[in-house]
Amino acid sequence: MKLLTALSELISIFLFTTIFIFLARKVAIKIGLVDKPNFRKRHQGVIPLVGGISVFAGICFMFGLSDYYIPHLSLYLICAGVLVFVGAMDDRFDISVKIRAVVQAVIAVVMMVIAKLHLGSLGYIFGPWELVLGPFGYFLTLFAVWAAINAFNMVDGIDGLLGGLSSVSFAAMGLILWFDGQTSLAMWCFAMIAAILPYIMLNLGILGRRYKVFMGDAGSTLIGFTVIWLLLETTQGKTHSISPVTALWIIAIPLMDMVAIMYRRLRKGMSPFSPDRQHIHHLVMRAGFTSRQAFVLITLAAAILAGVGVTAEYSHFVPEWVMLVLFLLAFFLYGYCIKRAWKVARFIKRVKRRLRRQRENRPNLTK
């Protein structure tokens, strides 16, 4: 595929999604598909929840525009469409967690039975021995689908963060697949980014605060499902493009945040799905950073971790078990910082004050 052709297609997807999201936000306001501020949501005014619907429209446009060969494409679009519809209904009418979990489980079963996408192996994470899962892989796949959807749902807490973290994941997968010759799958990843960018621009208020939109559960569900579909497509089989352990690095921040916060809630005797303000973005902002700064810092951290995974995938000299050990070390470091968040926040504030004093004193020294 010519690079110029690929670029023109991505620009077309971006422009289509931009136009669609502006039209969709008007419809959303009329039908009540909006997010209203409450004790946890501190935004001003009602915000249309059309980011996810627009991303899905952009992806449908991409597949209608091109002739890429994507295995079981029709099945993916049907499954994703169902999840987006249920997510939109949840955004509008607040569907119970149990109903959403059942729908996600049914979609996962359909994916495993018809598309044959499931975890059959976790690779060589124990040295020279491949960890083959057998029938247990189907149960683990069900959990993986649920985990991916909820991981990206949980990081959708401040402006731009879900879009930034998902773009990092899709970019990492896209680069690996592009250089591996999997052009169609790589373009799918890049198309996801092109469809997400208009949402990021409106969500951050780059085109004006009055055009602000949110992703909604429809969007976070779509992103999580697409990520796990692509990872199952590319990490399994005899000639897989991505090692299973690399998948952990590609979605590191959403995965770490979900596991850490659910563990903390369970230890307190709370439901793992109960809302709170203990996510990574809340803790970073508590350390004295603004919402925009937290978005940049967390996205940068995700890019670094994904970069480690991509580099190891290309280097081929770092064993998979070493990458697993390094990931677990990174996870425990993350957990340590989260568990002692107040100490970390106090340390960061102290450093920021010290740097501020140094900047203030510097002009006096030069006089």
From Swiss-Prot:
- Which pathway does UniProt place it in? Bacterial outer membrane biogenesis; LPS O-antigen biosynthesis; Bacterial outer membrane biogenesis; enterobacterial common antigen biosynthesis
* GO terms for cellular component: Gram-negative-bacterium-type cell wall; plasma membrane
Q: What class of enzyme is it?
A: transferase
Q: Which cofactor does it need?
A: Mg(2+); Mn(2+)
E.C. code: 2.7.8.33
Q: Which reaction does it catalyse?
A: di-trans,octa-cis-undecaprenyl phosphate + UDP-N-acetyl-alpha-D-glucosamine = N-acetyl-alpha-D-glucosaminyl-di-trans,octa-cis-undecaprenyl diphosphate + UMP
GO process terms (BP): cell wall macromolecule biosynthetic process; cell wall organization; enterobacterial common antigen biosynthetic process; lipopolysaccharide biosynthetic process; O antigen biosynthetic process
Q: Which family does it belong to?
A: Belongs to the glycosyltransferase 4 family. WecA subfamily.
Q: What does this protein do?
A: Catalyzes the transfer of the GlcNAc-1-phosphate moiety from UDP-GlcNAc onto the carrier lipid undecaprenyl phosphate (C55-P), yielding GlcNAc-pyrophosphoryl-undecaprenyl (GlcNAc-PP-C55).
Q: What is this protein called?
A: Undecaprenyl-phosphate alpha-N-acetylglucosaminyl 1-phosphate transferase
Give the lineage: Bacteria, Pseudomonadati, Pseudomonadota, Gammaproteobacteria, Enterobacterales
